[in-house]
A protein has these predicted regions:
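Glycine-rich hexapeptide-repeat left-handed beta-helix
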Residues: 26, 32-34, 39-62, 70-170
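Short HxH-centered metal-ligating active-site micro-motif
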Residues: 67
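Extended, small-residue-rich solenoid/repeat segments and analogous flexible loops
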Residues: 1-16, 170
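Long, hydrophobic N-terminal alpha-helical segment
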Residues: 14-22, 32
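Charged, well-structured alpha/beta interaction segments
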Residues: 6, 25-27
Length: 170
């Protein structure tokens, strides 16, 4: 995992980052909500605006209960809560993804796209494929929380406690 500009990366807690994640906090602030799951080989790089011939980088906000599957490049300006981004997606500069959204695997979202709440997008380039029910917010929240709990449980099992190691030495 490579976290550049760590002082500019704010995590609310209960977040999981797998191996080979790159977060570019050295460019601009990155704010993560709770239960954000970032899987292998994901690059999170804040976006920029061009004004009067100069480039200004913009902070990135990622909401609660967000899962980003492996091999994605994320350059959005904001990702809402209860969002699932499939494997191999490219999220272009200044994209805004609202709450309760599903992005299918291998989707490419062009720069400056606004993804409305309760929608499914997929394809190259991304296009609207359908609506999600209001239940998706609870489904995505449960999935992210369960993933976190399982991840923490697996980590605890992988690290033997001091009492267990003493007992095995007796």
């Amino acid at each position: 995992m490579i976290l550049k500009g760590l002082e500019n990366i704010r995590m609310e807690g209960k977040d999981v980052m797998h191996s080979q994640v790159v977060m570019r906090g050295d460019i601009a602030n990155i704010n993560l909500g709770t239960y954000v799951i970032i899987k292998e080989n994901v690059i999170i790089r804040p976006t920029f605006n061009k004004k009067h011939g100069s480039v200004q980088y913009v902070k990135m906000d990622i909401g609660d209960n967000v899962t980003i599957e492996p091999q994605c490049v994320i350059q959005a300006s904001s990702i809402g809560s209860n969002v699932h981004i499939g494997k191999g997606c490219i999220i272009g500069h200044r994209v805004v993804i609202k709450d309760n959204v599903k992005i299918l695997d291998d989707t490419v979202i062009p720069p400056d796209t606004n993804i409305p709440s309760f929608t499914v997008f997929g394809g190259k380039p991304a296009q609207y494929l359908g609506e999600l029910t209001e239940a998706i917010s609870q489904i995505n929240a449960d999935l992210a929380k369960n993933y976190y709990r399982n991840f923490v449980g697996l980590q605890a099992k992988a690290e033997p406690s001091a009492g267990a190691s003493q007992a095995s030495q007796s």
